[in-house]
A protein has these predicted regions:
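Structural motif corresponding to the intra-repeat A-B loop/turn of tetratricopeptide repeats
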Residues: 3-4, 45, 79, 129, ...
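Solenoid-like repeat scaffolds
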Residues: 16-28, 54-63, 93-110, 143-152, ...
Length: 197
């Protein structure tokens, strides 16, 4: 992903998800988020129709299903379908509500990861309405939460939120803020093209 190789990243994500035995995921709660890597790889590369075509995980895996609906909400917002985006967000919330409050994915609490997901979805809806300030505020909130996550490799969130906030700041004409954000990202993720471009 960091090198911008979308086909390779998507293939690897699909392969990883396919190799996860359902029995293992049932026995080890907190790892079903891996099932959503393919759809979030498509989000990462802006493949909105691909996001909507991606099959949902098995319903018993509530976290993976929730974040997959968030991915679909983002895609619908990017395609200008705000009503559909709202429906997808509602489905995400229904699935998040199925998870115990103390749930973890990897090393991090689902409450933190769900906050990032909700913020991304709300930001895309705000962007679609032309409300740059609200979109930037939501993404800034997500960056703050992401910065507080415990380290894991790969990260327990699918990609750096700064890579969404930076381009939005540029679109809004806030070039100095975008530059500062990208410089901060390069300290966390050296030499990544998402921040260098």
């Amino acid at each position: 992903q960091m090198e911008g190789r979308s086909a390779t990243a998507y293939s690897a994500a699909r392969d990883t998800a396919a190799r996860l035995p359902v029995e293992m995921l049932r026995a080890m709660p907190g790892y079903d988020g891996w099932l959503a890597y393919p759809v979030w790889t498509l989000v990462r590369f802006g493949r909105w129709q691909g996001v909507l075509a991606e099959p949902l995980p098995l319903a018993e895996f509530a976290y993976a299903t929730a974040v997959s609906h968030v991915a679909r909400a983002i895609a619908q917002a990017r395609l200008g379908n705000l009503e559909e985006a709202g429906r997808e967000s509602a489905e995400a919330e229904r699935n998040f509500a199925l998870l115990p409050a103390e749930s973890f994915q990897g090393f991090n609490p689902v409450t933190a990861l769900a906050t990032i997901a909700r913020s991304l979805s709300a930001a895309e809806a705000a962007r679609a309405r032309g409300d740059w300030d609200a979109a930037a505020a939501k993404l800034t909130e997500a960056v703050t939460v992401e910065d507080g996550l415990r380290y894991n490799e790969p990260s327990d969130w699918y990609f750096p939120v700064r890579h969404v906030l930076g381009p939005l700041l540029l679109e809004a004409g806030r070039n100095e803020a975008a530059e500062a954000l990208f410089r901060a990202d390069l300290e966390r993720n050296p030499e990544n093209g998402w921040a260098l471009t």
